[in-house]
C-alpha cells in the first residue's frame, strides 16, 4: 500500500474508488495499491 498525495492509475487494471472519503486505487497487481493521505 503506497500512501501518496496524488493517486494515479499505473496500468489499465487500476481503478480509482472512494471509500469513506478516502481515495484509493485497487488493482489486480498488488503493488499498485495506493491511498491518498
UniProtKB/Swiss-Prot annotation:
SUPFAM superfamilies: Ribosomal protein L36 (SSF57840). GO terms for cellular component: cytoplasm; ribonucleoprotein complex; ribosome. GO terms for molecular function: structural constituent of ribosome. InterPro entries: Ribosomal_bL36, Ribosomal_bL36_sp. GO terms for biological process: translation. The keyword Protease does not apply. Keywords: Ribonucleoprotein, Ribosomal protein. Belongs to the bacterial ribosomal protein bL36 family. HAMAP family: Ribosomal_bL36. This is Large ribosomal subunit protein bL36.
